[in-house]
Curated annotation (Swiss-Prot):
One of its GO terms (biological process) is regulation of transcription by RNA polymerase II. The lineage of its organism: Eukaryota, Fungi, Dikarya, Ascomycota, Pezizomycotina. This is Histone acetyltransferase ESA1. Keywords: Acetylation, Activator, Chromatin regulator, Chromosome, DNA damage, DNA repair, Metal-binding, Nucleus, Transcription, Transcription regulation, Transferase, Zinc, Zinc-finger. Residues 28-80 form the Tudor-knot domain. Residues 142-151 have a biased composition (Polar residues). It holds the Pfam family zf-MYST. Autoacetylation at Lys-316 is required for proper function. Residues 112-122 have a biased composition (Basic residues). A motif (ESA1-RPD3 motif) lies at residues 299-320. Residues 216-490 form the MYST-type HAT domain. Catalytic component of the NuA4 histone acetyltransferase (HAT) complex which is involved in epigenetic transcriptional activation of selected genes principally by acetylation of nucleosomal histones H4, H3, H2B, H2A and H2A variant H2A.Z. Acetylates histone H4 to form H4K5ac, H4K8ac, H4K12ac and H4K16ac, histone H3 to form H3K14ac, and histone H2A to form H2AK4ac and H2AK7ac. The NuA4 complex is involved in the DNA damage response and is required for chromosome segregation. The NuA4 complex plays a direct role in repair of DNA double-strand breaks (DSBs) through homologous recombination. Its main location: nucleus. Component of the NuA4 histone acetyltransferase complex.
Length: 502
């Protein structure tokens, strides 16, 4: 899971030389770079924050050449104070410009600069400004990801998400522009919003705050006990501030209520009678079940679900109102109940035709094929509705990898069937058969380099490597959804149930 630069270059701290000396638990401060034990090995890490919990001081460390998801709160005992610490450089004061004067409040026509005297921005400035104000199409991101194969393949050969900003890789042109856009948005938007402004700006897209600084917040929860699993969050989640002082918080795996005290949690578990998500069971096959939960009818449960998922989704922003959303939760059945594996949400009435607003597989169940089940189930529902579905854009790094794999496998399987029958096929036919939008089909074909222009005609070519890969994947046992076992009809909602509940 390490996600640093390809050459192993340092990714924490600035390139300027730093003062080095020994430190103590009392003198070390935010911004220092120290040696911290991780997985039994000493690693260079920058201390981003310090807090005091019930067990003592803890330090939030960003490890060198590791993805941001692997940042963690560590106790004092894991810091090596026998080695020198790199101290942060003092901030340089900006030199004052003696020529700078206060601009007059009212400028007369005589003092206004003429058009000739105004400096014309350079081509670089013009292009940067226009690109920053114009969002990049998803196609560029797909092609950019396809070129950066080395950045998406881990040391064990499995696909891993490594954002250049998070992991410290050298960003490409598209990545630089993406960062510039974010910085521009942060400068343009106020740091905080009032409740009224938040409501006005809140986008109905399953995504927990409109504040641009929320995404970059330091993770506030160190450890979560969820059923029989101990989870270590990846990102900040807006739980009550008092929970940040706890070494571990306890979350009921059925009702998703959260507690900071073990005694209170134990008392709750004795009284909690819920053994499955509070909704209608739509699908049951072997050990897998799917439940549909209406955000309007189960507000508390759905809000708790959003808080839980925010710890593992960087850009999830839905929290205030869950009324306009339906939540589809996948569970694994045991003798003790139905344990949540993952979920996806969708708008009751999507103006853009999205069939998924937010999707998550719980960390303890990742890399086991459950993510594919969630994606397949969302498309099966779209097929029953008679619609073409697509996830909300832009996708996260892990989401893009999962969807691209699903799209590739299904499109390839569909095309191989036509090839064996020696029949012609169109993009519209692929889209209708797989309940995918034509845009997603085209993007996938382009990413796989399967769409070519030959003799004044567009053709689809299947490379030999993809055929060989298909034969290998056939040998693997995959989890799939049986469409015949889905007991569901598209729900019909009143106008009030499709809107925000304020």
């Amino acid at each position: 899971m390490a996600g640093g630069t390809p050459g192993g270059e340092p990714t924490v701290g600035s390139g300027e030389p730093r003062l080095k000396s020994l430190a103590t638990p009392e003198t070390i401060k935010t911004g220092c770079i120290a040696w911290v034990e991780k997985e039994g090995q000493p690693r260079r890490a920058e201390i981003l924050s310090i807090k005091t919990t019930k067990s003592g001081k803890q330090f939030y460390c960003n490890f060198d050449n590791f993805n941001k998801r692997l940042d963690e709160w560590v106790p004092v005992i894991r810091l090596d104070f026998t080695r020198e610490v790199e101290w942060p450089n003092p901030e340089k004061e900006k030199p004052k410009d003696p020529k700078a004067k206060k601009a007059p409040t009212v400028q007369s026509k005589k003092t206004q600069p003429s058009k000739k005297s105004q400096k014309r921005p350079s081509k670089r400035e013009q292009s940067t400004t226009s690109e920053a104000n114009t969002p990049h199409p998803w196609t560029d991101f797909v092609e950019n990801q396809n070129r950066q194969k080395s950045a998406s393949i881990g040391p064990d050969g499995d696909s891993q998400a490594r954002a250049s900003v998070d992991g410290g890789e050298t960003p490409g042109g598209g990545d630089e522009m993406e960062v510039d856009e974010r910085e521009t948005e942060v400068k343009r938007e106020p740091a905080e919003f009032s409740r009224e402004v938040e409501i006005e700006k809140l986008r109905t897209s399953g995504s927990m705050t409109q504040n641009p600084t929320e995404v970059s917040r330091i993770r506030n929860i160190s450890k979560v006990q969820f059923g029989r699993f101990d989870l270590y969050p990846w990102y900040f989640s807006p739980y009550p501030e008092i929970f940040s002082q706890e070494d571990v918080i306890f979350i009921c795996e059925f009702c998703l209520s959260y507690y900071g005290d073990l005694k209170a949690f134990t008392r709750h578990r004795k009284k909690c009678t819920l053994q499955h998500p509070p909704g209608n069971e739509l699908y049951r096959n072997e050990e897998i079940s799917f439940f549909e939960i209406d955000g309007r009818r189960q507000r508390t449960w759905c809000r708790n679900l959003c808080l839980l998922s925010k710890m593992f989704l960087d850009h999830k922003t839905l929290y205030y109102d869950v009324d306009p959303f339906l939540f589809y939760v996948m569970t694994v059945r045991t003798e003790k109940g139905c344990h949540m594996v993952g979920y996806f949400s969708k708008e009751k009435e999507s103006a853009d035709g999205y069939n998924v607003a937010c999707i998550l597989t719980m960390p303890q169940y990742q890399r086991k094929g459950y993510g594919r089940l969630l994606i397949q189930f969302s498309y099966e529902l779209s097929r029953i509705e008679g619609k073409l579905g697509s996830p909300e854009k832009p996708l996260s790094d892990l989401g893009l990898l999962s969807y691209r794999q699903y799209w590739s496998e299904n499109i390839l399987e569909f095309l191989m069937g036509y090839n064996e029958r020696d029949e012609k096929v169109t993009i519209e036919a692929i889209s209708t058969a797989l309940a995918m939008t034509t845009q997603d089909v085209e993007h996938t074909l382009q990413a796989l380099r399967m769409q070519v222009y030959h003799k004044s005609d567009h053709k689809i070519v299947i490379p030999e490597k993809l055929i060989e890969q298909r034969e290998k994947t056939k040998l693997k046992r995959k989890r799939t959804v049986d469409p015949t076992k889905i007991q569901w009809k598209p729900p019909v909602f009143t106008a009030s149930s499709r809107t925000w509940g304020w």
